[in-house]
Design a protein with these regions (language model features):
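Conserved acidic carboxylate
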Residues: 4-6
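Two-component/phosphorelay signaling modules centered on CheY-like receiver
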Residues: 8-26
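Short, charged/polar "capping" segments at the starts of alpha-helices
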Residues: 10-12, 36, 54-57, 80-84
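Acidic, metal-coordinating helix/loop segments flanking the phosphotransfer/catalytic sites
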Residues: 29-46
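Active-site residues of response regulator receiver
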Residues: 48-52
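Short amphipathic alpha-helix used as the core "switch/output" element in two-component signaling
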Residues: 57-69
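Output/docking surface of receiver
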Residues: 75-112
Length: 112
């Protein structure tokens, strides 16, 4: 699983809570980082994505391709939301870390 966000606090907190739940996750800062890791042979079971990453049209195209293959959870802003990405699940800020983790665990369960 990948946690993709430029916000270190979000990445770190979600990863820590997932680790407590027995789920390992890789924290990545950008979609470019995600592409490099996938090109290196690591495939995610699920991607949690900060919606701010979707404002860039090039990043959007890369993520549309990814979202057709793996579940994607977008954490989006209420004030400046990114356009919806087809095939993804969206949560709007403000949202608590435990709510994000609960949604991730539910998505992993339904995907298996």
């Amino acid at each position: 699983m990948f946690i993709v966000s430029g916000d270190w606090d979000l990445r770190g907190a979600v990863r820590a809570e997932l680790r407590e739940a027995g789920v390992e996750a890789l924290g990545l800062e950008t979609v470019e980082d995600t592409a490099r890791v996938i090109a290196g042979g690591i495939a995610p079971s699920l991607v949690v994505l900060d919606g701010a990453q979707l404002h860039n049209s090039e990043m959007r195209r890369a993520l549309e391709n990814l979202s057709s293959r793996v579940p994607v959870l977008v954490i989006n802003s209420r004030l400046d939301p990114a356009p919806p990405l087809p095939g993804t699940t969206t949560m709007l800020r403000p949202v608590q870390i435990k709510e994000i983790v609960a949604r991730i665990l539910a998505m992993l369960l339904s995907a298996s």
